[in-house]
């Protein structure tokens, strides 16, 4: 038979192990979405979570101003993307718009190309692609102000805002 003090010590160790293994796994630390793939979650501010993309944007990006009619977005590895959305050009964010110019490709990868150009551009925190419906291209714009202001637009624009992955 064990002494009562040893039994208490064993109990404390077991409870501590339980807390470490099971409770901390709910708040798994991450750097990218692939760190969270085991649960189908996304990495938001360094924690795996299953919140909606729109809620993640509100948590992830300080002082973002979203038009109330914007109701959804999509997670991508480096950006949150919004369909039918543009920058509010009257806002400080919109006034940093840089017109990269027209991009045309032989397929529909022009959007990806615009996004990759933003990743290579100093201080780019957002990109916008306005598709030209009759071709495989469109206009590419970059934004540098860290306080995005977004509003609904026509059906041909796609907006991407950088994710603040730790």
From Swiss-Prot:
Claim: Chaperone is one of the keywords in the record: no
Intravirion face of the membrane: 1
Induction: Early structural protein.
Subcellular location: Virion membrane; Host cell membrane
Protein topology in the membrane: Single-pass membrane protein
Regions crossing the membrane: 2-22
GO cellular component: host cell plasma membrane; membrane; virion membrane
Keywords: Early protein, Host cell membrane, Host membrane, Membrane, Transmembrane, Transmembrane helix, Virion
Residue ranges that the UniProt entry lists as topological domain Virion surface: 23-166
Protein family (similarity comment): Belongs to the asfivirus envelope protein p22 family.
Protein name, per record: Putative membrane protein 162
Lineage: Viruses, Varidnaviria, Bamfordvirae, Nucleocytoviricota, Pokkesviricetes
